[in-house]
């Protein structure tokens, strides 16, 4: 039943985002990502979580899991200083695993949308504004997976990147936030169960100008 529910949701999303629009193209790109892409996007340096080790029980924790510097496993305060831990899975390319030729499993579906932007532009003769949508697997090497489905190492994303002129970005951002709210309500979620959260400026990703999260707070 779970897989059918997921497939129905994916199909409904694709229908609304691609089939029923004339300004969005669909994409199905590779899971493997060139390190150059993630280097220049900033992910190699900044796609990290702060990590601390407990010197007594040898467990590892994200910094946001620690309260008052106490290990949740054994109660020790003998913790290492937090250090950045990169969340991307690295894999070797070719027959020799000597570290010289490698790629990453994509941490998001966005990167291939950006790297294929020119291909989509040339093959469809489009002009901005237009969007590119993609669904598929993404991978993150979580330090401590858990929290139901919210901290897992393999997961599925449904993503749209919408390209517009710089002076129209705020207008389109507001449009898409409201569009996503309306779509989720159409799927049967009650308005009082949908929380809209605007991230503060100091909590934005390194590539983000603004972020609005929609969260299901009750079922």
PLM region spans:
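TRNA-recognition modules of translation machinery and tRNA-sensing kinases, especially anticodon-binding
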Residues: 1-217
């Amino acid at each position: 039943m779970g897989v059918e529910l997921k497939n129905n949701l994916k199909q409904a999303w694709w229908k609304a985002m691609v089939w029923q629009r004339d300004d969005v193209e669909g994409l199905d790109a590779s899971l493997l990502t060139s390190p150059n892409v993630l280097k220049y996007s900033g992910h190699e340096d900044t796609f990290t979580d702060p990590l601390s080790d407990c010197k007594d029980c040898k467990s590892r924790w994200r910094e946001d899991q620690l309260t008052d510097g106490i290990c949740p496993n054994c109660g020790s305060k003998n913790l290492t200083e937090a250090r950045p831990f990169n969340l991307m899975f690295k894999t070797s390319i070719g027959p020799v695993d000597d570290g010289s030729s490698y790629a990453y499993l994509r941490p998001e579906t966005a990167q291939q949308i950006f790297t294929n932007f020119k291909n989509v532009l040339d093959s469809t003769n489009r002009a901005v504004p237009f969007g590119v949508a993609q669904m598929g697997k993404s991978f993150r090497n979580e330090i401590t997976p858990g929290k139901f489905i919210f901290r897992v190492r393999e997961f599925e994303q449904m993503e749209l990147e919408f390209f517009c002129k710089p002076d129209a970005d705020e207008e389109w951002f507001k449009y898409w936030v409201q569009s996503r709210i309306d779509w989720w309500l159409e799927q049967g979620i009650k308005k009082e169960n949908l929380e809209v959260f605007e991230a503060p400026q100091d909590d934005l990703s390194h590539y983000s100008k603004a972020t609005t999260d929609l969260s299901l707070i009750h079922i």
